[in-house]
Amino acid sequence: MKSLIYIFLLCVSTITAQTKYEQGMRKAFELWGSEKTEEASNLFERISTAEKDKWLPHYYVAQIAIIKNWKDFDNREEVTLKANLDKAQEYLNNASSITTGNAYVTYLQAQLYTVWVAHDGMKYGMKYAGKIGQMYQEIIDKHPDNPLFIAAKASWDMGSARYFGKPVTPYCEELQRAIKLFATFKPETEFHPKGSVTPYLETVKQCNE
């Protein structure tokens, strides 16, 4: 009888913990969707501290820190950019320690490196450009129909082509394929990254120029 009571209490505790996690994540996304970015990031941080085995809160803290740098990018200050990316790297490292070989963590690491390259191509291009392309190819090989990964690689390839004065058309087919896949893509769970087709609808216009 005591064993049954213990099992019951354990199950109740697990369900309660999952509910708190889910409620917290939903609230964080709600804040983010309302453009309360700092509040969302702070909540993701608190969740990551409470939920030691969950990689997604760490992922979103890192993602928010990365995205911050694209706002008013032309007027960026390296001190601020570095602080944001250092924080992002810390949380990506945390996520990696929880989930080894996770394609989404690899994707976000490539996004982080992209900010460095965009900030100073002469300084960081040689260091990160090759890694970025390799990372994207690696995750696409594992997940060939994930539109987030396909679009990111195609967009990166197009940017690289423009930088070197080459045509972007060889990458348009993959970008267009990703845009179509976004319409039917279903993330693994409610909280998994799903991306947005919106920025790529702008990028694909370059294919008609």
How would you label these PLM feature ranges?
Residues 1-24:
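Bacterial Sec-dependent N-terminal signal peptides
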Residues 18-66:
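Start-of-domain marker
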Residues 26, 60, 67, 108, ...:
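"A position-specific structural signal for the A-helix of alpha-solenoid helical repeats
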Residues 38-41, 64-94, 111-135, 155-199:
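Short coil/linker segments at helix-helix boundaries
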